[in-house]
UniProtKB/Swiss-Prot annotation:
Sequence repeats: from-to residues: 3-20, 27-44
Pfam families for this protein: Cuticle_1 (PF08140)
GO MF annotation terms: structural constituent of cuticle
Expression across tissues: Calcified shell.
InterPro entries reported for this sequence: Cuticle_1 (IPR012539)
Alphabetic keyword roster: Cuticle, Repeat
Keyword NADP: no
UniProt name for this protein: Cuticle protein CP466
Transmembrane segments: none
Length: 44
């Protein structure tokens, strides 16, 4: 779950931080992870 999303990154509820390149956004968010618009995956 996303706790905070800003123009330069995302803070997930579990404390993970993911810095995002300009223009990259979350395109899919599930209970176990997220897929970013640049194809990267974040597991939590």
């Amino acid at each position: 779950e996303v706790l905070l999303e800003g123009p330069s990154g995302v803070l997930f509820k579990d404390g993970q931080k993911k810095y995002l390149p300009p223009g990259v956004k979350i395109v899919l968010l599930t209970e176990s992870g997220a897929v970013l618009s640049n194809g990267d995956n974040v597991q939590f």
